[in-house]
């Protein structure tokens, strides 16, 4: 029978390891979130395990899901079974489906406030963690981790419990002391076989620096085949005490070597102890070989799945058979693996066990598939939910195993123990845990006395038999000491771990699942607690036995529903209770909605009046009370649900919150009790003690059989300890109250101490208010930031599917499954992907995509169609981060935080769709300092580089071959080269002018090398350069400066080649920068280059050296080159003597026209009285300009040009339009409109005549 070692030592969470546990242990996340949501704390916080951030509790997801369900129910057709009795009335309507209108965009986004990561972690450690480590939530978490070790197997399993085996401690080898510098240098010289001889100190130091850098360089090779590799890691783990070597994620490696025990395949299958990972691995199939004594033994094989191993092993067996028959050796092939030398096999992928032991939650697709037709079980939280208990039980049955691997199963186990002997072991273990953290001697002794009354005395509520007490050596009261109880705690755990937990697992076996009705009924009776027969049955009391002021009220659940059809903004949300909890007397213990409990979108802090009080769905209030306070039956129930306004007058809302806090004080780590103790006020401390002891007194009235002697004894104890004049814990009750209680103490009833209870509750209001205010003040120091989340809802997916009636449901489901499967493809199948790529495209690499903007855009769209664009976006963002200047720390920090929040969470990189395997994720987080670093704002740059490598690996080996083998890519490659060049030319006209996502254009505008040479020679020719300079001056304001800049840079290059003094070169650089890039004359940038290039030149002028102006000169060259063909056409019709005169004439005409336009703008703003002068100012410059052009052309041979004639007509049209616009604006509606119109018309006619005359002369 297989054996399994179990630990009796629970995990120990410390402040140093808290972040690592929180990032990896879902058990701890569940219990810590329950702790943070208790009514004791005014701010309800929860840890989102998917995003690794603490967030303010928000009910928006629940409200959204509720409305989605309502919409879906309204749009689904009515079941035809309801139309049986209504035949003929609604036949046409019975199967009609109300399809939602496509114009109505259903908004599933919601906003949530999150604590800033660094500040939030520090605040949690300082204000919440100490109390959590002393709370029942933490104790129960420790017990749950121990119980989760128990598993069930159909073939049986032998458990061995020990305290020297701790699977949850992160085993880290002690760091060796750093070697001395001399020893380190000696080892490097020995490794490289180098003797430095007569080298100087500087040369020696530089050489050692380079040698150390070469040692630290890691080469990442991406190979598509199985490669033998010599294992350099530590030897194979063989002993059972080292099975859980990473301390967090259990991984067992079964070794078949001589030093380890031989375990059968059935053992490995049933025990589940073969090494496996919880998420699909993206690693290559690699073989790690360990050398021992020069023989190739202990070969390690890594496979992505069991199926892949079986295929490879069957092929090996067939080859061996063929070799035996034919006599030909097949071991010479490179892919040959000798399985006779394999010591153990590691599987990177198995069907995901729905257990919270793993870092990665179950795949989203599996959860969606299971909950597709069960709307009531849809996950409403933003974090990844585990599979439901029934589904998980079905999965375990199909795999012939079962364990208590998550919080939900653990809660079922607690219910299974109700009324059994296992429950007594449970509470004894918990009481020992409580005893261990009590430091106050008085409270320590009081707790010991209560334990004796509960377990040792025969009338105790959880009395243990003499046999059990004798086994634990607790028969005598003197043995009930803290040290002895600590020593026997492991023995108390053994019955739970070795009997009750396996028995619970057995109930989920296949035989029990398929049992007959009688057997199921019998099993149900066994799970229920036994009820003792009461010979004197009690009568239900109709009136309450306690004042309303001492009972937590139940407000109505109020809240505004979120409109799903609004763009993105939400209204204020009223706080809603997380769930209805039951007190010992079956009174729901809910939160009190605050008057101003809304959280506005965009607000950075919660209002002071906001009080979020809630209990989680896992909290059982009957177990939150002390063991003596658990009430089995409720004889007094108030069926009237009270509203907020119905709260008793005693204290109002503060009293309600105080009562709720007191009822869960032990699960909150006695947070309020410690505040009262540390305040120094004895009355506050005594009042808290009295309230807890009073609940034990009330508990006696809710047992099945009333025991008058115990009631009388407890009443006398309370009176003597807290109320009597000489009481040791006097609560300060007034004399009349003491006398009244003394007169009614015989016989005692439940309402005997109601007066004292109201008195202490009123007195405790003051410390409660002080504690809440101080906690709020500390919380206000933490900065909040708003984040937008999207609800992952099956209802929304169904609604979205209703819009696509043309696509069949079956085809849609197949497509979705194929996409999900494709996005989670194994990297081990890289060879298959590349085999499907045509031979002509196999040379295509990811770098080629980056250099081809058109195909890069198609590749991005291809990934989006397969819902995998995150891979490319992640790679691009990290690449942009790497290219940010190191000195710009602020920008690098912002980009790093952005990458961390968007990609490094359990929705992508650390989730089921991660491009890295679980082992690779562990290596990356160990490189960053542990899994706790995921809770911080950013990771180191080296970690981001490693992440980028894994993302690039999947892009190159999975998505790129799929893209190259697609039909769309093949059809695009058949297009002519000329059409491709045109497409590239059009893409260059984009504003960013970048070929990739981050780097500038690489000479895509150049058509031929001959034209480049001709243009460069022209710019170096003083005459042609001067003509070209005047020509481009007509095209743009800064183009003329571009010619000068290009020439000055050429002179700077010649200066660098002359090997002159460095100061002269730096002076030249400064001159060029001051003239063209950072000019004192506005604008500062005098040439047509991007601002980013200018900024780079200013910041890196020293680092770039002689190449400081290289990119700027290339950009200017490209801009000017566009005008070179036009200039060549212009020179054809003119001689060299006439070129400058024509260009100067055009330049002067351009300046005059600009001045004319300026005057026209000024004239348009003038009043009616200044019309005549305005009209003159509009026409005179133009006429003067035209007459000047006539005089300048006088005496020359008149020529006529069609282009000039068209230009003159265009000018005439513009001037007439301006004139008409001025007239319409200035004189509409005036009495003198007709008289004033005549001179303006004459001016226009004269202007037209002059322009026409000038055109003819030209």
Swiss-Prot record:
GO BP: negative regulation of signal transduction
GO annotations of cellular component type: actin cytoskeleton; cytoplasm; cytosol; fibrillar center; male germ cell nucleus; nucleus
Cited PROSITE patterns: RGS (PS50132)
Tissue expression per record: Expressed testis, including in Leydig cells and spermatogenic cells from the spermatogonia to spermatid stages (at protein level).
Highest taxon in the source lineage: Eukaryota
Key words of the record: Coiled coil, Cytoplasm, Nucleus, Repeat, Signal transduction inhibitor
Region (Disordered) location: 581-604, 1145-1172
GO function terms (MF aspect): G-protein alpha-subunit binding
Cell compartments where the protein resides: Cytoplasm; Nucleus
Regions of compositional bias (Basic and acidic residues) in chain numbering: 1154-1164
Function: Inhibits signal transduction by increasing the GTPase activity of G protein alpha subunits thereby driving them into their inactive GDP-bound form.
Protein name, per record: Regulator of G-protein signaling 22
Taxonomic source organism: Mus musculus
